[in-house]
Amino acid sequence: MPKILFIEGVSGVGKSTLVRRLTERLRGQGYSVKSWVEFDFTNPIDFYCTAVVSSEEYEDLCSRYPASLETLRQYTVFADDIKLVRYYNEDTPLFEQPLLSELWDREFCYEPKNPVPLSEYARIYQAVWRQYFSTLGQETDYLIFDGSLLHHPINDMMRNYHADKEQILCHIRQLLGTLGSQERTIYYLRTDDIAAQLARAHTDRRQNPTSAKEVEFWRQRYENDQFVLQWVDENFQIVDVSNKGWNNALEMILADLV
């Protein structure tokens, strides 16, 4: 069975770059690797620009948009009674208007207009994770996820539900419970100066300068992350990437794995 690696940390610490480099190095050593970075719409356990629809709503969409029926089915995640429809591939829409807007109105977690209740959000997440991890084969050595365990779920819970630390911890524990005895490790990238790291990341990405409110959000996110790691009872490593220490971080993770 594959070993599962969760690469975590607040925004701007270099998670996606490290996932790409780690994937390349492991493949170079002969390992079979599947990995997903942020905004990869093929990620089986993460959701960005994904609509949640009931069975009745899904049937209605299929009926009203017969020309898009094949595409709808292609980009739908089915789990229990749940239908999740991915409608963007990064900046590229997967559907035309007006169907695209209808799906956007049903966004599941990324700045949703009408968030589902927190209990339903957790149930949907767990159902998708349980289905995916219960059907893993033997053909892959490593599965590497960029921010799928802590980064995106905790962002959702803080921004959309104003969840407290105990609620966040409960959700993450339940997600990890869907993995059963599957071997996994959390590698958490940390930096001594969150504000400075965010500023560098925004400059590199040609984004607007960070605001004081944004810095405060990520400091609170970091505190929530540390609370979860302290109490979640999982195998994790804190990896220091202060002072551009990504090369050392990569070598440390590789040494830990192989």
Regions found by a protein language model. Give the residues of each.
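Glycine-rich phosphate-binding loop used to anchor ATP phosphates in small-molecule kinases
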Residues: 69-176
